[in-house]
């Protein structure tokens, strides 16, 4: 389903990812582990095209996504939960979820607000609170929930 083949990514002159290759078959779960600065976040950002690999290929569900715009990668069904909390602080929890909503995708779970409130009961209790009123942990829950509202086939 996801294939990363010999990607090389840089920040300026710093060569962060060197010929990185791996495959994640459909239905598998993979974790990226490593020390600080090992390239875990850069790997995820390179897959999503938030950091453009200088070389190599990234293929998702048979589509080459190297060089694509990040929003087009997301439309293909790749969900991304950023490390840093990314919510709309002036919107309520419920409004943040609505912003992330996408049509159902074949082969993917169709997430609803109620399913996410069952998964994150703290958010259910705060559905009418603005994002800026949430704790850091609740903001991260909301970031994850909003990603799932996009009905990605891969997170």
Regions flagged by a language model, labelled:
Residues 130-134, 138:
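Conserved ABC ATPase signature
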Residues 30-31, 80:
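Short beta-strand immediately N-terminal to the Walker A/P-loop
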Residues 12, 53, 68-70, 93-111, ...:
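ABC-type ATPase nucleotide-binding domains, specifically the catalytic core motifs of the NBD
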Residues 147-148:
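ABC ATPase C-loop
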Residues 48:
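Helix-to-loop junction immediately C-terminal to a conserved catalytic motif
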Residues 56-65, 76, 109-118:
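Conserved ABC transporter NBD signature motif
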Residues 33-35:
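The feature captures the beta-strand-to-loop junction immediately N-terminal to the Walker
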């Amino acid at each position: 389903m996801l294939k990363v083949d010999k990607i090389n990514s840089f920040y300026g002159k710093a060569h962060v990812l060197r010929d990185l290759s791996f495959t994640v078959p459909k239905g598998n779960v993979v974790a990226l582990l490593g020390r600080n600065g090992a390239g875990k976040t850069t790997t995820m950002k390179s897959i999503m095209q938030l950091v453009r690999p200088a070389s190599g290929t990234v293929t998702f569900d048979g589509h080459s996504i190297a060089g694509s715009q990040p929003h087009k990668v997301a439309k293909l069904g790749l969900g991304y939960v950023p490390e840093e909390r990314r919510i709309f602080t002036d919107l309520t929890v419920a409004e943040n979820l609505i912003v992330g909503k996408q049509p159902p995708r074949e082969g993917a779970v169709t997430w609803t607000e109620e399913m996410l409130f069952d998964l994150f009961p703290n958010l259910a209790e705060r559905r009418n609170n603005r994002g800026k009123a949430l704790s850091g942990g609740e903001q991260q829950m909301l970031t994850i929930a909003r990603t799932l509202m996009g009905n990605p086939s891969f997170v």
